[in-house]
Amino acid sequence: MAIGLIGRKVGMTRVFTDEGASIPVTVIEATPNRISQVKTLEQDGYQAVQVTVGERRPARVTSSLKGHFAKANVEPGRKLQEFRFGAEEGRDIKASGELKVDLFEVGQKVDVTGITRGRGFAGVVRRYHFGGGDASHGNSLSHRAPGSIGQCQTPGRVFKGKKMAGQMGNVRRTVQNLELVRIDEGRQLLLIKGAIPGAPGGDVIVKPAVKTVVK
């Protein structure tokens, strides 16, 4: 595992290279992440850093969290996130400190996690891209029906995981190995190549990639 940042998706735009190539990028606003706790092997059994970001109304902060934030001397945030790290990492990290966009480098590969847009109840054509039935030739009732969902008496049930109509979206998803194209330290922005999960304004988690792509 590695240390990352909590950010907020701003939207998409494009940047141009010196050669004139257009690169679609997603803009992530990563304001300084305040360190609320540092976990150690001796006390917690593993090493991790817990961060918070943004603001939260005092009425929305529970008593236990008020004490937690007060102990670290940081303002309560809208989100808490924990990043585990190895034995050789995080030596300079201390509670009440901050993590900023300079944690990353241009050209680095990152993984981005977010909550996808909720689409509500959707049929199989929209949800799983089923082909659907004939538009005519005697078909008048099942243009967008899923068709058969299983066998008869053996096994006499529908298998788990069968692709059927249901809730679409609003789930946690991670996109791996995205390239970090540009970093704007002045405005605390990360420009990442390609699309990421979620709607503009949603919280995302940016971490160094856990897998390496061999070309």
Swiss-Prot record:
Methylated by PrmB. The keyword Heme does not apply. One of its GO terms (cellular component) is cytosolic large ribosomal subunit. PROSITE patterns: RIBOSOMAL_L3. One of its GO terms (molecular function) is rRNA binding. Keywords: Methylation, Ribonucleoprotein, Ribosomal protein, RNA-binding, rRNA-binding. InterPro entries: Ribosomal_uL3 (IPR000597), Ribosomal_uL3_bac/org-type (IPR019927), Ribosomal_uL3_CS (IPR019926), Transl_B-barrel_sf (IPR009000). The modification N5-methylglutamine is found at residue 153. Gene3D superfamilies: 3.30.160.810, Translation factors. Signal peptide: none annotated. One of its GO terms (biological process) is translation. One of the primary rRNA binding proteins, it binds directly near the 3'-end of the 23S rRNA, where it nucleates assembly of the 50S subunit. Part of the 50S ribosomal subunit. Forms a cluster with proteins L14 and L19. Belongs to the universal ribosomal protein uL3 family. This is Large ribosomal subunit protein uL3. It comes from Nitrosococcus oceani (strain ATCC 19707 / BCRC 17464 / JCM 30415 / NCIMB 11848 / C-107). The gene is rplC.
